[in-house]
């Protein structure tokens, strides 16, 4: 394996372009994403307005079953704009990020942009440079305790902000994000009331926390194989998540927008066929919470590698690939080299 996780993706990028030069045509912005952002923002606000006179149970149920999906999709488009894939130029993309941020209440878009680009640059460099890597204090605190794992994952944003690498210096767009969001949140309080705001807040917390969609954060760089720092998800929730599960593909080619990631995998299938993949965010989330083998330090860079049994939540791991390596090689039918297909709930 290359010396760093970043180098692993760089080498794959070069190799894929050498073997499949047509992949270059997939790179570039996808401007229809702008329409998706407008529709999703309008839908989120409309739902918040619709629940203002319903029961609290209805508010919570809709947050879980509908709102979380809308909020998560908006987060996906903030991610797309972070890579300048929604419009031409960084300034236009930052403005679209502010729009997508509106129903999420917390002014997180510009801060995320800075942190996420550093994550790509320093992937797997723990102790301060990879902005998604947990701190050692966080690892020591959480340990294998199911209760602490649930708490840390549910309050992930607060842990995230406490990580040294995630300090974001102030600039004009960061301040603009705060100001625009403060005005938007005040307007939303007036428009949709307490229950509507609760709907928006709970939806956002679930989308990036204790919900099958939130398990995306776990799956992306969970070290299931020593030679693979990034993992994709090929389950059904990609359909409502704008293919954000195609994460190896994304790190290989950050300049390819979401609707073209499947095409990348189809063209360069030889480079993706033998990688470990997840098929169920739900199953991963439950395993992380309640299986004591799953720990925070299974993030790439800490050297901890999970090896569940064949009957466990990730039964592809222990099967030998066609080259004799450990690691659940994925066959063309979506199973693994032994013919065992992972469970694919959601």
Where do the language-model regions lie?
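Generic hydrophobic alpha-helical membrane-span motif
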Residues: 47, 85-86, 227, 256-257, ...
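Helix-boundary and loop/linker segments of multi-pass membrane transporters
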Residues: 23-27, 53-54, 86-90, 231-233
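Membrane-cytosol interface motif
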Residues: 94-102, 229-241
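Acyl-thioester-dependent acyl-group transfer interface
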Residues: 226-227, 337
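Transmembrane alpha-helical segments that form the membrane-embedded catalytic/substrate-channel core
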Residues: 68-78, 108-110, 158, 201-226, ...
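Histidine-centered catalytic micro-motifs
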Residues: 74-83, 112-124, 217-223, 240-256, ...
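Non-catalytic, topology-defining segments of multipass membrane proteins
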Residues: 1-68, 102-199, 259-260, 265-346
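Aspartate-rich (DDxxD/NDxxD/DxxxD) Mg2+/diphosphate-binding motifs
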Residues: 76-96
């Amino acid at each position: 394996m290359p010396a760093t996780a970043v180098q692993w993706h760089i080498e794959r990028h070069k190799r894929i372009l050498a073997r499949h030069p047509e992949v270059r045509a997939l790179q570039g912005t996808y401007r229809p994403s702008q329409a998706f952002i407008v529709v999703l923002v309008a839908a989120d606000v409309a739902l918040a307005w619709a629940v203002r006179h319903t029961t609290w149970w209805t508010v919570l149920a809709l947050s879980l079953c509908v709102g979380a999906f809308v909020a998560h999709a908006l987060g996906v488009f903030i991610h797309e704009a972070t890579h300048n894939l929604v419009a031409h130029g960084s300034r236009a993309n930052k403005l679209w990020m502010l729009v997508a941020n509106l129903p999420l209440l917390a002014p997180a878009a510009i801060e995320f942009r800075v942190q996420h680009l550093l994550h790509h640059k320093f992937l797997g460099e723990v102790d301060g440079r990879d902005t998604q890597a947990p701190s050692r204090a966080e690892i020591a605190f959480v340990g294998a305790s199911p209760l602490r794992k649930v708490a840390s994952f549910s309050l992930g944003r607060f842990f995230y902000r406490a990580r040294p690498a995630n300090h974001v210096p102030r600039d004009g767009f960061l301040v603009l994000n705060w100001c625009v969001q403060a005005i938007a949140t005040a307007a939303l309080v007036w428009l949709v009331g307490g229950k509507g705001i609760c709907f928006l807040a709970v939806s956002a917390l679930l989308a990036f926390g204790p919900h099958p969609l939130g398990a995306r954060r776990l799956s992306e760089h969970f070290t299931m194989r020593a030679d693979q720092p990034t993992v994709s998800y090929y389950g059904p929730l990609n359909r409502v998540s704008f293919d954000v599960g195609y994460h190896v593909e994304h790190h290989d080619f950050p300049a390819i927008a979401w609707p073209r990631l499947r095409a990348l995998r189809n063209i360069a299938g030889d480079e993706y066929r033998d990688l470990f993949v997840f098929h169920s965010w739900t199953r991963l989330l439950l395993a992380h919470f309640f299986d004591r083998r799953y720990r925070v330090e299974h993030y790439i860079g800490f050297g901890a590698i999970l090896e569940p049994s064949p009957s466990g939540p990730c039964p592809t791991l222990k099967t030998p690939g066609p080259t004799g390596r450990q690691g659940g090689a994925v066959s063309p039918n979506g199973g693994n080299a032994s013919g065992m297909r992972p469970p694919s709930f959601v």
